[in-house]
Amino acid sequence: MKRTLLLTAIVAFAGLNTAQADDFGLWGDLAVQKNITKSFSVDAGIDLRAENELKDFTRIGAGVGLGFKATKWLSFGAGYTFLHDYNLSETKPSYKKDGKTFRGYNVDDAYWRNKHRAAFDVSGAIPVGRFTITVRERYQYTHYVATNTQRTKYRSEITDLAGWTGKVYTICDRHFSSMEQEKDAKGAKDKHYLRSRFGLEYNIRHCAWTPYATYEFSNDLSHQLHLDKQRLTVGAEWKITKQHRFDLAYVYSNGADDDNNSDCHALSIGYKFKF
């Protein structure tokens, strides 16, 4: 079993290319859960994210959910989340219609955007000795609300700077004679994803801490299940009492689904109150 776990972890890390991550973040969430019956439960929570090397808050979210435990090993869930996301400033090269001839850069200012998200889950848990294997399949729909930002266009590259006497605009170590600013409309759009997650946790005898690891990947349902994002999480849950739970984890995300583009290492801190 230990050899299998080690091999699984190595494969997951290799596939994620963690060395390519270019950001560090701090994620936090607070949640409450109420058991209505032995089978039904409701929950609510808020989450905050600070990224861009902890320089910017990039997410404020709030959600509610409903859970149904069909058997000891099978459960279902549904939820809604409102997201207020911050999109960092982005610089992209611009090309002519042939797709090859470089003409300059487009720089989009940072902006906030609202999203509405609905999710439906099917989860399974199978105990194997002191280990528990978990599987979750989630359909996730996200609606992006239309908004506006400002775009700056740099055009007409200067190839002979020494002999140039006009205005100079510099970006990405290249020089241009023209700079224009315009409103950039970010239209409303919808995204559909299938988010699959596999996990393993270990029950340490006479210990309040339960270590776990999960591997999750997101497939775009609108583009032939294209793999857009992978996420690896390694952490532990502390069962303080029957009602209070504390969670601490390291998260690595690679790629972008309907969240912001992010190749990011993050420290995740969570607290849940169950009653």
Language-model features: where?
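Repeated loop/turn-to-beta-strand initiation elements of outer-membrane beta-barrel proteins
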Residues: 39-44, 73-78, 129-133, 206-211, ...
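Residues that define the transmembrane beta-barrel architecture of outer-membrane proteins
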Residues: 24-26, 58-60, 114-118, 187-194, ...
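Start-of-domain marker
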Residues: 21-69, 73-86
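Transmembrane beta-strands of outer-membrane beta-barrel pores
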Residues: 46-52, 80-86, 126-128, 139-145, ...
